[in-house]
Amino acid sequence: MTRLMLIINPAAGRGGFRNGLGDALNLLDKGGCRTTLFFTSGRGDATEFAAKYGADFDIVGCVGGDGTLSEVLAGLMRLENPPKVGYIPMGTANDVATTLGLPKNDTVSAARRILN
């Protein structure tokens, strides 16, 4: 079973993560992921979560926008052997997702990419 950490910014995209999150979590579960959720409540939380707990997981996923992704990556850069990164873009601009051609504000499609 794949250990997946999902760091969720509930303020990203005006809280749009709620739409489809349950379906995405069900898909991840059926795909063999044991998912643990971490919710941010302020600036820097995603960095600290990733740095403190990231090494305990096979994949660290980010549910949020460009800022949340940046924080997660900053935290993972502190680790000697960082895990793989998954991204469920749910921000307002999602510039990173646009550049990489990732589905935006579509939790289920993004969850499928994490499984692959």
Regions found by a protein language model. Name each.
Residues T2-N116:
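Small-residue-rich beta-alpha loop regions that form the catalytic core of phosphotransfer
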